[in-house]
Design a protein with these regions (language model features):
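Short alpha-helical donor nucleotide-sugar binding micro-motif in glycosyltransferases
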Residues: 254-255, 262-267
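Aromatic "clamp/platform" in nucleotide-sugar-dependent glycosyltransferases that forms part
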Residues: 275
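Conserved acidic donor-binding segment of nucleotide-sugar-dependent glycosyltransferases
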Residues: 307-318, 326-331
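Conserved donor-binding/catalytic core segment of Leloir-type glycosyltransferases
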Residues: 14, 191-207, 213-216
Length: 373
């Protein structure tokens, strides 16, 4: 990742996530924290659970564990002490979930703490406590314009805060076209030289891998092997489902970044069937690696992919299977999509662009706080 220019005034920035497990938004916070630190700011992740401690430490980010896994008076007081006059003494706190809004709102009652809500869920929070706490939010960051408009339509109270659309970014120097890495991955996994499909993400119900398996089963036999990168509660049921359908599905678990780059470059096509995806980092990584993408055209995916991928009707395995069959048979189209994919990722979804956009708004908010203080 290239160096990014320094800030005018160093800020103390907390990244608050009460998530129990490492999620895509956790990874974004880690990358963002490192990027903002590179601009001269002091960044600290504030978490509730050990998996998050290890995850942020693996990204060389300072971490503080607090009892913020639930909306409780104990957790709120601990957070207020840490972010207010405690060792963190933050100027700005970026929050990940509705619970984090509530906790940060309490922490900001006696200090000019700036709260920034980075929403990454398909639907906005609408419970009464969060609506009241939202009065303390200075800015909401949306991943796509589609997500912003849906949130405003379903939760009009969110219009109280300023907002900005900032797509997530990936390291386009790491995630890049690499034929040698792709060949090596195929060799290690015994995938041969034929077509290979790739899906990346947690093996959880919201990802709708069942739709993907049903879609692949519509391809004229023999269907290409499908590699699934990720872990989760549904692995057993997905294995059974694949066996019933007679599909060759390789469950390879969660891969480190270098191995994941190989997986993307080994893929003939990267496939994604979640119908309400907000913003898939896996699709951005695939674009950065110059891979043809076929995805369900729901949620924020059409805005994310644009003309650099193929969109299928959401929730329709028959249509998805037909489009997949056509794409596998059309080498020229795949080659054109690969070029468009890489170009779109570099132009729109680099880490450098994401950090610059966040730095612009966070530094402006921090300067305003300093003047008020």
């Amino acid at each position: 990742m290239a160096a990014i220019g320094a800030a005018t005034r160093p800020l103390r920035i907390a990244l608050l996530t009460s998530s129990r497990f490492w999620r895509g938004s956790s990874n974004v916070f880690a990358v963002l924290g490192r990027g903002l630190a590179g601009r001269g700011h002091t960044t600290t992740a504030v978490v509730a659970y050990d998996p998050l401690v290890g995850g942020f430490q693996a990204h060389s980010l300072s971490v503080r564990k607090l009892p913020v896994g639930h909306t409780s008076l104990k957790g709120a007081r601990a957070l207020r002490q840490a972010l207010g006059s405690g060792e963190l003494a933050a100027d700005v706190v970026l929050v990940d979930r509705a619970r984090d809004i509530r906790l940060a709102a309490f922490a900001s009652l006696r200090t000019p703490l700036v709260v920034v809500y980075c929403i990454s869920t398909p639907r906005p929070p609408r419970d009464l406590l969060t609506r009241l706490a939202f009065r303390r939010v200075a800015l909401t960051v949306f991943l796509t314009e589609q997500l912003a408009q849906r949130a405003f339509a379903e939760a009009s109270f969110m219009r109280r805060a300023r907002h900005r659309v900032i797509p997530n970014g990936v390291d386009c120097d790491l995630f890049r076209p690499d034929e040698a890495a792709g060949r090596a991955f195929r060799q290690r996994r015994g995938l041969g030289d034929g077509a290979v499909l790739l899906g990346v993400g947690a093996l959880e119900i919201e990802k709708r891998w069942d739709l993907l398996l049903d879609s692949v089963s519509r391809v004229a036999p023999p269907a290409p092997p499908l590699v699934l990168c990720g872990t989760g509660a549904l692995e057993g049921s997905l294995r059974a489902h694949a066996e019933r359908l007679g599909l060759d599905v390789r469950f390879v678990g969660q891969l480190d970044s270098a191995e994941l780059v190989g997986a993307y470059n080994a893929a003939t096509c990267v496939v994604h069937t979640r119908p309400d995806e907000v913003f898939s980092l896996a699709l951005i990584e695939a674009l950065a690696c110059g891979r043809p993408v076929l995805a369900a055209g729901g949620g924020g995916t059409p805005e994310l992919v644009g003309e650099a991928g193929v969109l299928a009707p959401a929730g329709d395995p028959t249509a998805f299977g037909r489009l997949l069959q056509d794409l596998l048979a059309d080498h020229e189209r795949r080659a054109a999509l690969a070029l468009a994919a890489r170009r779109r990722a570099v132009e729109r979804y680099s880490v450098e662009r994401m950090v610059r956009d966040y730095a612009e708004v966070v530094e402006a908010l921090g300067e305003g706080r300093g003047k008020r203080g």
